[in-house]
Amino acid sequence: MKTNLSSQISLHRVSPRYYRPENAFEKSVLTRLEKIPTDIYESVEEGANYIAREIAQTIREKQKAGRFCVLALPGGDSPSHVYTELIRMHKEEGLSFRNVIVFNMYEYYPLSPDAINSNFNALKSMLLDHIDIDKQNIFTPDGSIAKDTIFEYCRLYEQRIESFGGIDIALLGIGRVGNIAFNEPGSRLNSTTRLILLDNASRNEASKIFGTLDNTPISSITMGVATILGAKKVYLLAWGENKAAMIKECVDCLLYTSD
């Protein structure tokens, strides 16, 4: 929305009509310059709980139809509140994940998936270890595979996603340089799962996990832009003022991709 707001909005400072339009006309005025639909919430918890409910509804609908629900999920801080609410719904409301397929969006390379600072380990500790998902329904890029097998490995990862009917919901954060998963700004729209070299900004950000820059892997196996946008629903999460400028670029500005 064409309004300079934080994800922590103080109601005495900003009128709700600027982020919670009352009718279709007000919404059309506020969103007329948006390239993608955008919702603003008063708090992280409110926004995260809404997305968790949307995910839970899709899981239950798929259960009733006797079908898998395929989720593409990241690690990182942005989705942590969503995962917390999903765990609560599992424990307190009986939400089952037995019909859920999870694909990890990316993994550092070279790095074992079992490493304490792997993205997969973060995803397990934040969500997967606390729900009743079948372990055979969890898939992650393997950061320990041989270099000469990466191309074929990535092709098979895409093939496995398609074998389950594609992704139902992709959950994303956005990096400080505007990356989704590890697709940097300007990545090809038709890119699929592949090995990429991390730029300096991404490595510096990742070094917080690995302790030092020297210990930080130089590359990552990541789902591509086409893989992510092929999902039936995509939720991009951004909390706090430090993401405001990046979200403005995503929502209001023209699209640019590399050749």
Language model segments and positions:
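N-terminal glycine-/serine-/threonine-rich phosphate-binding loop
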Residues: 2-70
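Ligand-binding beta-strand-loop-alpha-helix segment within the catalytic cores
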Residues: 19-35, 95-169
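Glycine-rich N-terminal segment of FAD-binding domains in flavoprotein oxidoreductases
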Residues: 64-92
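Active-site histidine-anchored catalytic micro-motif
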Residues: 68, 83-84, 92-115, 166-169, ...
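Glycine-rich beta-strand-to-loop/alpha-helix junction loops that act as flexible
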Residues: 73-78, 172-176, 239
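Glycine-rich anion-binding loop/nest that anchors nucleotide
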Residues: 171-173, 216-250
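Class I SAM-dependent methyltransferase SAM-binding "motif I" and its flanking Rossmann-like core
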Residues: 181-225
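Conserved small/polar residues in nucleotide/adenosyl-binding loops
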Residues: 256-259
